[in-house]
Amino acid sequence: MSDNQSWNSSGSEEDPETESGPPVERCGVLSKWTNYIHGWQDRWVVLKNNTLSYYKSEDETEYGCRGSICLSKAVITPHDFDECRFDISVNDSVWYLRAQDPDHRQQWIDAIEQHKTESGYGSESSLRRHGSMVSLVSGASGYSATSTSSFKKGHSLREKLAEMETFRDILCRQVDTLQKFFDACADAVSKDEFQRDKVVEDDEDDFPTTRSDGDFLHNTNGNKEKVFPHVTPKGINGIDFKGEAITFKATTAGILATLSHCIELMVKREDSWQKRMDKETEKRRRVEEAYKNAMTELKKKSHFGGPDYEEGPNSLINEEEFFDAVEAALDRQDKIEEQSQSEKVRLHWSTSMPSGDAFSSVGTHRFVQKPYSRSSSMSSIDLVSASDGVHRFSSQVEEMVQNHMTYSLQDVGGDANWQLVVEEGEMKVYRREVEENGIVLDPLKATHAVKGVTGHEVCNYFWNVDVRNDWETTIENFHVVETLADNAIIIYQTHKRVWPASQRDVLYLSAIRKIPALNENDPETWIVCNFSVDHSSAPLNNRCVRAKINVAMICQTLVSPPEGNQEISRDNILCKITYVANVNPGGWAPASVLRAVAKREYPKFLKRFTSYVQEKTAGKPILF
């Protein structure tokens, strides 16, 4: 055959020097870098089956290895300066190893390189060694039959390809042998036919011989054997045709079985790759979808700073998104406030307490009258309507106070128009839903009972602007526009913006009053009344939406008589608080959002403020 030489280029005839056999297994002690704390530690290292494994010690091999790496794609790097060290890296995993001496290191490197080389696909010695698993013997006289059961399904495609190469060599030699046999047979047949034709021609020319009795004598069997002798073709005496045929059949069966297994392996790999491709395709689809959604959200957010995505008559943000954004902004403000309060507490305990009291020491339960001024706003004074300083809003203040004393103290628990929205201990918050021209004007009323403080103390802290920032967390800034009297001022304040809602500002008159009891059994009552007014010093501006308010903090002090002749202490006093708020927020915020914010923020304000008053008055003289 013309291709016989090329087909046999990787035949089974091998030079003994090149056939080194399988790589030698190796084991021994090497120092391995563990970490920067423990440094180099001796480990028992085993090199076997193209895998490098290490154990803590030789005695602990039965407990399993501490780690192992496959050497197929390993990179072995001798250290440039340390003659005993070499590194083995596979992807991101790196082993730092040290041998006893440079020769020991070189022995390990050579052994590892040998395992790595023998693990590679396509090496000549690897294919020859794999082909030797086929139990077919090449010889001139015949080949042993090979059962297809010897081709185990567990072999890899690489091994099966090596077997196919061995089968190819065997089959080529078998074909050559059979071709020689057929050529010899053909030559013998052609010579026999030529000789037969020649003998026949000679017989036709000869005369028959005569016997003694006169009869003719014809040549029969004897002459035939001489004329047509049994000729054995030259060159086929040493060939067992039947054996060659059986071996050829076994070889072709082996090729078909191995080829079938190769196809099966390729189909499995194709299925595996198809699954991986499907998985990667699905991942890509998800990533593209997530990217698309992220870009959509990013485009949204890029426009959220514009006027179309803020509170307004033509806002593009829907009610649900509006509520979520407001809630998220309030949560952030709460976290900032918690951090601020924690810092204040830390600074409070790290510094010494100032001497003196915020309140004037006036005894334990006797009320002393003294002039009221903003500089001593926390001092006690009996503020009654008759002693108020007259100013241009006096009649308006009087009307507001009388309305609150008449209507705000009424019990609304049984009124069907009022809804109980929050109840936490002594605190109850009611709301009555009112809308006017699409604007939420829900009146709100809260009742609370606080122990250890008086109504005068609560109202003073609520009215006094000097301590406003200590408990008020929703104000961005404020200032007193005008002082009308010692107990009445006009305040302009700007509230912190809660995106996407517009920022609000408020201009209001704040007045504090003491309402004298009609009889000695009635509780002492203090009131702070805040209601919106106009002032030339604080005109409307485009930056904020001006809100209108009518708020009252009404506090009544209840005293339980102490036992015996003991003086009244804070354990004997209770402040009953009624807080009412009528707010027109203005703007275009959704009604559901305003109601949800009010339900959330009003109880928080009341708890925070009353806790602040209790904290500030603890241990100080009682101010009735």
Curated annotation (Swiss-Prot):
Q: Which UniProt keywords apply?
A: Coiled coil, Cytoplasm, Endoplasmic reticulum, Golgi apparatus, Lipid transport, Phosphoprotein, Transport
Q: Which residues carry this modification: Phosphotyrosine?
A: 372
Q: Name one Pfam family in it.
A: START
GO terms of biological process kind? ceramide transport; intermembrane lipid transfer
Record PTM Phosphoserine, positions in chain: 126, 132, 135, 315, 373, 377, 380
Please name the SUPFAM superfamilies in this protein's record: Bet v1-like, PH domain-like
Localization recorded for this chain is:
Cytoplasm; Golgi apparatus; Endoplasmic reticulum
Q: Where do the PH domain residues begin and end? A: 23-117
- Show the coiled coil region(s): 263-303
Keyword Endoplasmic reticulum among UniProt keywords? yes
A GO MF label: ceramide 1-phosphate transfer activity
Where is the segment annotated Disordered?
A: 1-24
Q: How is it modified after translation?
A: Phosphorylation on Ser-132 decreases the affinity toward phosphatidylinositol 4-phosphate at Golgi membranes and reduces ceramide transfer activity. Inactivated by hyperphosphorylation of serine residues by CSNK1G2/CK1 that triggers dissociation from the Golgi complex, thus down-regulating ER-to-Golgi transport of ceramide and sphingomyelin synthesis.
Reaction(s) the record says it catalyses: N-hexadecanoylsphing-4-enine(in) = N-hexadecanoylsphing-4-enine(out)
Q: Which residues bind an N-acylsphing-4-enine?
A: 472, 493, 530, 579
Query: Where on the tree of life does the source sit, at the highest rank?
Result: Eukaryota
Q: Where is the composition biased (Polar residues)?
A: 1-11
List, alphabetically, the GO terms of the cellular component aspect: cytosol; endoplasmic reticulum; Golgi apparatus
Q: What is its main location?
A: cytoplasm
Residue ranges occupied by any START domain in the UniProt entry: 389-618
Q: Where is this motif: FFAT?
A: 321-327
Q: What is this protein for, i.e. what is its function?
A: Shelters ceramides and diacylglycerol lipids inside its START domain and mediates the intracellular trafficking of ceramides and diacylglycerol lipids in a non-vesicular manner.
Free-text note on domains in this protein's UniProt record: The START domain recognizes ceramides and diacylglycerol lipids, interacts with membranes, and mediates the intermembrane transfer of ceramides and diacylglycerol lipids. The PH domain targets the Golgi apparatus.
On subunit structure and binding partners, the annotation says: Interacts with VAPA and VAPB. Interaction with VAPB is less efficient than with VAPA. Interacts (via FFAT motif) with MOSPD2 (via MSP domain).
Give the protein's recorded name.
Ceramide transfer protein
Organism of provenance: Bos taurus (Bovine)
Q: Taxonomic lineage per UniProt?
A: Eukaryota, Metazoa, Chordata, Craniata, Vertebrata
